[in-house]
């Protein structure tokens, strides 16, 4: 049995710069990983079978991103003659990241499967090939595959590695799940934030264009942010529902965590520019 980190991410800022004819939104965002997340346990099989041993309530196994990622890797590697005969896996997950939380849990799980099985099966696919497979599963998967903090443009697929300060964060889940389309389909979502260079953006105060909609539509998000903002600069991550406050030290973050109201599910984690998954591979 092998054990593989599947870390969370934060969007340190997120700006919606337009909407394409196909309905997808163009954006500028800054991804950073957390030293906190799910863990995947993978046992290679030799009969070509993929088994997910920890099903998710309400999600058919074949629809789960973990299984879809494994099958896609199997297909691409097989078609290019790089899949050893009988390659398969038993996969289980220790889930800590909430669904619909804006922490990238599902995308991170898919990326960890691609990276881990490519390694365990010895397929030899390049990072670019794995990222291309990942993009077909979700716009956030490639950044997890590449494993470095990044400035993202387009629909999130154009990635430039960056090294923002590695701060400490108090991340709070307000107890609701926000499906991404709920935010992106809202007619009041800002969709015309001017594009700026990464150098300019890094000098500006960070914000998230989705936050105003999430706060308006989900009172729990509004309450969580209102509480966090009493202590430190705080924002929504992704389309929510998680919010986060940033601190210079772990002790400062933990002091605030101790005062968190009971209805708020919160944790402290460090921002890291190299994914914990990729640290394992070094």
Swiss-Prot record:
Coiled coil: none annotated. The active site is at residues 9, 140. The keyword Kinase applies. One of its GO terms (biological process) is isopentenyl diphosphate biosynthetic process, methylerythritol 4-phosphate pathway. Keywords: ATP-binding, Isoprene biosynthesis, Kinase, Nucleotide-binding, Transferase. Belongs to the GHMP kinase family. IspE subfamily. Catalyzes the phosphorylation of the position 2 hydroxy group of 4-diphosphocytidyl-2C-methyl-D-erythritol. InterPro entries: GHMP_kinase_C_dom, GHMP_kinase_C_sf, GHMP_kinase_N_dom, IspE, Ribosomal_Su5_D2-typ_SF, Ribsml_uS5_D2-typ_fold_subgr. GO terms for molecular function: 4-(cytidine 5'-diphospho)-2-C-methyl-D-erythritol kinase activity; ATP binding. It catalyses: 4-CDP-2-C-methyl-D-erythritol + ATP = 4-CDP-2-C-methyl-D-erythritol 2-phosphate + ADP + H(+). Pathway: Isoprenoid biosynthesis; isopentenyl diphosphate biosynthesis via DXP pathway; isopentenyl diphosphate from 1-deoxy-D-xylulose 5-phosphate: step 3/6. ATP binds at residues 98-108. Homodimer. This is 4-diphosphocytidyl-2-C-methyl-D-erythritol kinase. Its EC number is 2.7.1.148.
């Amino acid at each position: 049995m092998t054990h593989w980190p599947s870390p969370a991410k934060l969007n340190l800022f997120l700006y919606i710069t337009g909407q394409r004819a196909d309905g997808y939104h163009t954006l500028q965002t800054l991804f950073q990983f957390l030293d906190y997340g799910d863990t995947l346990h993978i046992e290679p099989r030799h009969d070509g079978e993929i088994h997910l041993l920890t099903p998710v309530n309400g999600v058919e196994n074949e629809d789960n991103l973990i299984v879809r990622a494994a099958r896609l890797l199997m297909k691409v590697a097989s078609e290019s003659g790089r899949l050893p005969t009988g390659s398969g896996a038993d996969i289980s997950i220790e889930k800590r990241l909430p669904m619909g939380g804006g922490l990238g849990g599902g995308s991170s799980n898919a990326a960890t499967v691609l990276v881990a099985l490519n390694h365990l099966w010895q397929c030899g696919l390049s990072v670019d090939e794995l990222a291309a497979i990942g993009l077909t599963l979700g716009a956030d998967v490639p950044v997890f595959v590449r494993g470095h903090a990044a400035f993202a443009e387009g629909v999130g697929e154009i990635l430039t590695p960056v090294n923002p300060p590695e701060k400490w964060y108090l991340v709070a889940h307000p107890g609701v799940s926000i499906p991404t389309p709920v935010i992106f389909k809202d007619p009041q979502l800002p969709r015309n934030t001017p594009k700026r260079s990464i150098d300019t953006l890094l000098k500006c105060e960070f914000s998230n264009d989705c936050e105003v909609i999430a706060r308006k539509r989900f009172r729990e998000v509004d309450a969580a942010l209102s509480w966090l903002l009493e202590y430190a600069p705080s924002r929504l991550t992704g389309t929510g529902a998680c919010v986060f406050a940033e601190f210079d030290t772990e002790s400062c973050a933990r002091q605030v965590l101790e005062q968190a109201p009971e209805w708020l599910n919160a944790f402290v984690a460090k921002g890291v520019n190299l994914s914990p998954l990729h640290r394992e591979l070094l």
